């Protein structure tokens, strides 16, 4: 996520061009961690870490009714690309138990990412 026209400047989240990676808080958090690790490696004269990214988005449609999308991405020749067969979307025909589980997973995801961001 280092700017091609401004070395030393890194762009993450909604301001970045991350190919198929969605504009989401989870993606931005993931990108920011990799950028921080890359900057630390540069300062220490070490190789940058291998770029691998994940994204998970949950949406609560109503009480006990959640949906999700998830994917894994990697760097390929300076671009972000999908890892083949890694993108998953909640099935359209999911039953009530599945939707309820997705709603609970979404609440757990929110608690986890909030803790990751703010509890430091």
Over which residues does each language-model region extend?
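Short, electropositive, low-hydrophobicity segments enriched in small/polar residues
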Residues: 17, 36, 66
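FAD-binding beta-loop-beta segment adjacent to the flavin cofactor pocket
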Residues: 1-10, 61-81
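A generic secondary-structure signal marking the coil-to-beta-strand transition
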Residues: 7-8, 55, 88
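C-terminal auxiliary extensions adjacent to catalytic cores
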Residues: 68-120
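FAD-site-proximal beta/loop scaffold in flavoenzymes
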Residues: 1-30, 41
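A general structural signal for short secondary-structure boundary/capping elements
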Residues: 16-19, 43, 55-60, 103-109, ...
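Internal hydrophobic alpha-helix adjacent to the cofactor/substrate pocket in enzyme cavities
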Residues: 28-53
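Flavin (FAD/FMN) cofactor-binding core of flavoprotein oxidoreductases
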Residues: 50-66
